[in-house]
Amino acid sequence: MSDPAVEVTPAVPVASPAKAKKEKKPKSDKPKKPKAPRTHLPVSDMVVNAVKTLKERGGSSVQAIKKFLVAQYKVDVDKLSPFIKKYLKSAVEKGQLLQTKGKGASGSFKLPAAAKKEKVVKKPKKVAEKKPKKAAAPKPKKAGEKKVKKTIAKKPKAATATKIKKPVAKTTKKPAAAKPAAKKAAPKPKAAPKPKAAKKETKPKKAAAPKAKKPAVEKKPKAAKKPAAKKA
């Protein structure tokens, strides 16, 4: 009897923890250097400002640009010269700057006319944006027009209400006004005897004054009795 064959699996190498630690050590050993804060603007902004302020018809040379940076920003041009050359090349390729003389990073540079036109056009755009905001003030007028429409719509309603009330008032007041008219007509015949009082006033009572004179005339003939003296 032959013994059955036994399968043997190969042993898998296990990474020791010491090796893993060795791999992490170099990462922790490298100290991070603190980045020094910038004391100036980016090179692109400084170069563009230099070309704008110099305003040379034939373009500003690299030397003129460097002198401007030293005077304006007080920068070490020797350290920034490679960055200046890189920006000039990329700016010419992108169309941000025009190279009037030389090739590559040497020669003269100026701003393209399209960039100047865009800057000039941007200013009126800002003014045009502000004007519609001021012109938007007439919006309250629309609200006023709505108010006028509402008031006009309400006026006919009030007119119809008054028209309905007027005939009702006329029908009720007419019989009431007729009653006092009859009452006033009754006292008119009572006023007729008033002329009688006027006739009494016209009687000339004072004209009867001559009656007082009659007794004076009657007394005079009584004095004629004097002839009685003849008897003596």
From Swiss-Prot:
Transmembrane feature ranges: none
Main location, first listed in the record: nucleus
Gene3D superfamilies hit by this protein: Winged helix-like DNA-binding domain superfamily/Winged helix DNA-binding domain
Gene Ontology, cellular component aspect: nucleosome; nucleus
Subcellular location: Nucleus; Chromosome
PROSITE patterns: H15
CDD domains reported for this sequence: H15
The keyword Flavoprotein appears for this protein: no
Protein family: Belongs to the histone H1/H5 family.
Annotated protein name in UniProt: Histone H1A
